[in-house]
């Protein structure tokens, strides 16, 4: 590998490591060019591919999510990191049900969520989802009261390590669900993100 290509790869790696958020191809190119490093998008892609190969036998991986590329710990190693975080990342069953309904039925109103869940949606759940930046208001339904329409955000996709909402697993058919299966799927491990 030519020295310049290896340097570009190292520059890209350092940007991804230090950014604290996913970076788009165009952002990487712009940052490098602002530092006097002439590079086109194809070279950035080659650098990312080389990084992906370099990490194949390590605990790190290059991941493409909804808002760009990021470095992260592979899932196989995430259990080792749980003691580093004091924040409890477990989500309540009601929060999980609410975000699931929004993800699969978006755009959806609070009333529609309540109709599907069969119980009232707590203001704290909606606030929690908004504070996590997992949902946002996309508009208002043209009905009496003009209820807010909720959709998921790119942050939600990033935290689930997916690029687009269609990457979510399909919903099982209604008759295929037993109550035990519904209860067993109410936890997401966010520590690897």
Model-found features: residue ranges?
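Short alpha-helical segments that sit at the start of domains
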Residues: 1-12, 70-97, 193
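Phosphate-centric recognition/catalysis
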Residues: 1-2, 7-8, 158-193
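Short amphipathic alpha-helical interface segments
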Residues: 12, 16-17, 21, 88-108, ...
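Short acidic, hydrophobic short linear motifs in intrinsically disordered regions
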Residues: 22-32, 107-117
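Short amphipathic alpha-helical interaction segments
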Residues: 38-50, 117-131, 144-147, 178
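DNA major-groove recognition helices of helix-turn-helix
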Residues: 51, 55, 129, 156
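A short, conserved structural fragment
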Residues: 52-63, 133-142
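Short, cationic-aromatic polyanion-contact patches
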Residues: 64-83, 139-162
């Amino acid at each position: 590998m030519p020295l310049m290509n290896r340097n570009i790869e190292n520059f890209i790696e350092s940007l991804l490591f230090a950014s604290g958020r996913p970076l788009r191809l165009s952002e990487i190119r712009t940052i490098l060019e602002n530092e006097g490093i002439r590079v086109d998008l194809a070279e950035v892609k080659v650098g990312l591919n080389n990084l992906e190969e370099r990490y194949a036998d390590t605990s790190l991986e290059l991941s493409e999510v909804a808002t760009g590329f990021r470095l992260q710990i592979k899932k196989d190693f995430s259990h080792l990191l749980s003691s580093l975080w004091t924040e409890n990342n477990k989500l309540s069953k009601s929060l999980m049900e609410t975000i699931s309904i929004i993800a699969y039925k978006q755009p959806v109103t609070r009333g529609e969520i309540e109709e599907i869940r069969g119980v009232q949606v707590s203001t704290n759940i909606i606030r929690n989802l908004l504070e996590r930046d997992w949902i946002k208001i996309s508009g208002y339904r043209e009905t009496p009261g003009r209820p807010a329409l909720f959709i998921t955000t790119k942050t939600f996709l990033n935290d689930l390590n997916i690029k687009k909402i269609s990457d979510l697993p399909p919903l099982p058919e209604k008759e295929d669900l037993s109550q035990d299966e519904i209860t067993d799927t109410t936890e997401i491990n966010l520590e690897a993100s």
